[in-house]
């Protein structure tokens, strides 16, 4: 199954989608979603639901699509706590729930840095007409991985008006 590159993977491998392939996937998938919606046969697709919300001036409900992180504490079986399920790594280990409260971890320098680091924005995003939809690649883990910027631009170019037409 062809998929998107995992974050941090810079390899050139045929098992990962190219930017053009990903643009095709997004556009084709959204057109199916859109046509089903118009026929009254709506099935929620979280990514598209969130793009509709963003296109209509609202926030996304999925934390990663707002362009910055929020704390989504993950507690492992041994009590280890991390700020997000995508960052259960030694680097982002906050503490153990048996020794420190959530509010103490929330105010910890490491947790504050986790959130602060998510606001870093690529220079090319600052003047992009689709920033209000893309939010600089959304979740910071997506910004760390291979660049699908062109895919999103192609998708938004073809779908922006339809996204604005649908309201949740």
Which positions does each model-derived feature cover?
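Radical SAM enzyme [4Fe-4S]-AdoMet core and its adjacent flexible, acidic
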Residues: 1-68, 74-77, 86-97
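Flexible mid-to-C-terminal extensions adjoining Fe-S/redox cofactors in radical SAM and related proteins
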Residues: 88-168
């Amino acid at each position: 199954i062809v998929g998107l590159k995992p974050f941090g993977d810079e390899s050139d491998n045929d098992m990962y989608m190219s930017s053009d392939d990903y643009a095709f996937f997004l556009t084709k998938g959204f057109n199916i979603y859109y046509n089903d919606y118009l026929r009254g046969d709506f099935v929620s697709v979280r990514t598209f639901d969130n793009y509709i919300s963003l296109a209509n001036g609202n926030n996304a409900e999925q934390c990663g699509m707002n362009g910055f992180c929020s704390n989504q504490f993950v507690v492992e079986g041994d009590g280890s706590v991390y700020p997000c399920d995508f960052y259960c790594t030694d680097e982002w280990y906050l503490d153990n729930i048996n020794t420190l409260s959530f509010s103490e971890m929330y105010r910890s320098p490491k947790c504050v840095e986790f959130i602060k680091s998510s606001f870093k924005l690529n220079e090319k995003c600052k003047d992009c007409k689709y920033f209000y939809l893309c939010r600089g690649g959304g979740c910071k883990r997506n910004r760390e991985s291979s660049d699908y910027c062109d895919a999103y631009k192609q998708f938004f170019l073809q779908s922006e008006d339809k996204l604005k037409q649908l309201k949740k």
